[in-house]
Amino acid sequence: DIVLTQSPASLAVSLGQRATISCRASESVVNYGVSLMHWFQQKPGQPPKLLIYGASNRGSGVPARFSGSGSGTDFSLIIHPMEEDDSAMYFCHQTKEVPWTFGGGTDLEIE
């Protein structure tokens, strides 16, 4: 299985500042030139919301303050500027190989 290691496990960021969450895969998640790494946001009592797919593409209705980057094994989610509504859990997710796997999550809070 592809193991996804997320860091940090928790993060506190001031409003208007930048939050950076990293995800490292145990092997490349690139398939035919496409990075099959995605990012989700989850709030208590709600299903996960797709933020970023294919490493850097924003999902439908996702604000421009969310961006993704990376390739191969190393990926990042950046939120800038941080807003109150962004306090949530964030997960990376790979779909290159079955079983699809998730990172352990990052608990992002307002500082």
Curated annotation (Swiss-Prot):
Keyword vocabulary terms for this entry: Adaptive immunity, Disulfide bond, Immunity, Immunoglobulin
The keyword Disulfide bond is annotated on this UniProt entry: yes
Region (Framework-2): 39-53
Region span, Framework-4: 102-111
Complementarity-determining-2: annotated span: 54-60
Pfam families hit by this protein: V-set
Keyword DNA-binding in annotation: no
Biological processes, Gene Ontology terms: adaptive immune response; immune response
Segments for region (Complementarity-determining-1): 24-38
Region (Complementarity-determining-3): 93-101
Disulfide topology: 23-92
Cellular compartments per GO CC: immunoglobulin complex
Residue span of region Framework-3: 61-92
InterPro entries named among the record's database cross-references: Ig-like_dom, Ig-like_dom_sf, Ig-like_fold, Ig_sub, Ig_V-set, IgV_Light_Chain
Region (Framework-1): 1-23
Coiled coil: none
Superkingdom of the organism of origin: Eukaryota
UniProt cross-references to PANTHER family, sorted A to Z: IMMUNOGLOBULIN LIGHT CHAIN
Protein name: Ig kappa chain V-III region PC 2413
Protein's organism: Mus musculus (Mouse)
